[in-house]
Amino acid sequence: MARWEVVVRRWLLRSSLLLVTVTAALAATTLPAMACGEEQTHGPHTAAARSTGAPGAEKNVKAVGNVPDAQGAIALQFLQYGNRDVMVVSGEFGLKTYDLTANPAAPKLIGKLDMPGMWETEDTEVDPLRKRVFLSRDPRAFGGNVRTGESGVYIVDLAKPEKPTVLSYVKVPAGHTTSCINDCQYLWTGGPAKADSQPAEWGGRPIWVTDIRDPRKPKVFPQPIELARNDGKTDYVHDVQIDAAGVAWASGRGGVRGYWTEGMHKDPVTGKVRPASPTDPVPYAGGGINETAAPSKFMHNSFRPVGSMAPDGGSAGHWGNGNLIYATEESFLDGCAGDGVLVIASLEGSYGGEGWRSTPQKPYRLKTIGTWGVAGQEGSDPASADCSAHYFDVRDNVLVQSFYAQGTRFLDVSDPTNPKQIAYYRPADAAAWAPYWHRGFAYVADNNRGIDILQLTA
């Protein structure tokens, strides 16, 4: 590249935007504000040197290990083989497996499945019983694009972690993320923005259901679900998380909505009791997030502290156990202050199907009780505009969350109305995507650095 050219990295190394290269004559042009999931965003990145302001910063945490050969990492999972502890890493390279048994701070590479150009495998899930991994193929994988690219799911056998083996691949009309439903007998696959072949009125791809009870012959159901989620408009479903009570929470543009996927339940929309299934789930609760907390309306992932996980998510107080939802807003605006934040909302008032009746004329929104963003916080780089919240994990009232170039942040959420930062780790070259609590450490999938292994010191 000639010296007089510049690389605009406003959206470099973030899961929602493309690398844009322009000449110096265009460098001063104001780039439009976007959120994850706009027409051509959240695609593969081109590696480039990071331009940083302040050097790296850390407090109350130390790095005990790093796995640089996992550069391009996007998601992690952990599988147990008797006394053997194996970490599964998915990313732009495909899949890698590491043995943590002898030393969890020094993962040992034991196997890999090479898929160069893979995208995106975000929040990759595993079947811990059958030892399988589900890799979601975004239409932008292998040089494709949102409008016409192929999407689908790879089912990978990890019975022998040294030899990851593809059992099957199935084309699916969505492919940004895929999630286990009903103990990994089914998959829900959603996102990204809509293809040219999909209805023009859609804002993004909803969820398609795949029956994987026979993993060598997966069956995709033709009719999508989780429609009309954005005030009556079918829109981008980004990811799904299952809470400890078995409710599947779908996050995306328009908020977070929960569903029963098995058993008999009263449908709050119809008022009738009916069986729930992966292909015909029963609405439970949830709805849009108030725009004063999340102006983009694009919710990325969520966590509901309930059941065995209730103690992890802070004091429910007068809201009652199971009535809180933690959710990431992923959004990128010019500068840092307007980027996506962590939102904590109350589910009170949403159990009657309100989130399914919401319209632009009569919108329904959950009540926000707390938020936290990285802009202006101790440890942040004021020169970086790469500040959106991303994936998080919660244990014992400590929420660890990735903020891309602003690194990894540890928050005390014992009072959900007032999350407080207690530690941070921000290397100068950070591209933190997803943290995971495991064996007392926080393992961070960093798209630039590989895997950072962190330990709180206070």
Where are these regions (language model features)?
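N-terminal secretory signal peptides that target proteins for export/translocation
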Residues: M1-W11
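Feature marking well-ordered beta-strand scaffolds used for ligand recognition
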Residues: W4, S15-A458
